[in-house]
């Protein structure tokens, strides 16, 4: 039986998307250097966790799946490090918004995509 090492991370996020992505990449590199083969970064890490905030400006954070800059960047990192990255992102598909998860394989290929319609979920947090 093959042994697989999985890492799950948690980090404080800000409204600075670039800083959050860089911090996530640093965590991925650290986990990889310690032997993790599958590395999970927290849900919707590009910004503060906004689904519990009733602010229309948050819809500006959504990006389409095709040619998604975050997925492309993380795909390159997965390939470089040879790790699997389940990657959460806020997706816009026409006028529908999803809390999506792309599975990026160790060769950088996106294997699967799972979607949850973000506005149908109850608010389960408070600020």
Question: Where on the chain are the PLM-derived regions?
Answer:
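Cys-nucleophile CN-hydrolase/nitrilase-fold catalytic domain and related Cys-dependent amidase chemistry
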Residues: 17, 29-107
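Active-site-proximal beta-strand elements of phosphoester/diester hydrolases
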Residues: 3-15, 100, 113
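Conserved functional loop/turn residues at catalytic and ligand-binding sites
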Residues: 10, 35, 122
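Short hydrophobic alpha-helix segments
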Residues: 107, 113-114
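Conserved small/polar residues in nucleotide/adenosyl-binding loops
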Residues: 116-121
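Short, acidic/polar
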Residues: 20-28
């Amino acid at each position: 039986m093959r042994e697989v090492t999985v890492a799950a991370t948690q980090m404080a996020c800000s409204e600075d998307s670039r800083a959050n992505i860089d911090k996530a990449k640093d965590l991925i590199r650290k986990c990889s250097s310690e032997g993790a083969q599958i590395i999970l970064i927290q849900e919707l890490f590009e910004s503060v966790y906004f689904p519990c905030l009733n602010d229309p400006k948050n819809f500006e954070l959504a990006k389409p799946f095709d040619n998604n800059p975050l997925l492309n960047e993380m795909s390159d990192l997965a390939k470089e490090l040879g790790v699997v990255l389940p990657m959460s992102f806020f997706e816009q598909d026409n006028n529908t918004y999803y809390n999506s998860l792309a599975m990026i394989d160790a060769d950088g290929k996106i294997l699967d995509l799972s979607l949850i319609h973000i506005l149908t979920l109850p608010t389960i947090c408070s600020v």
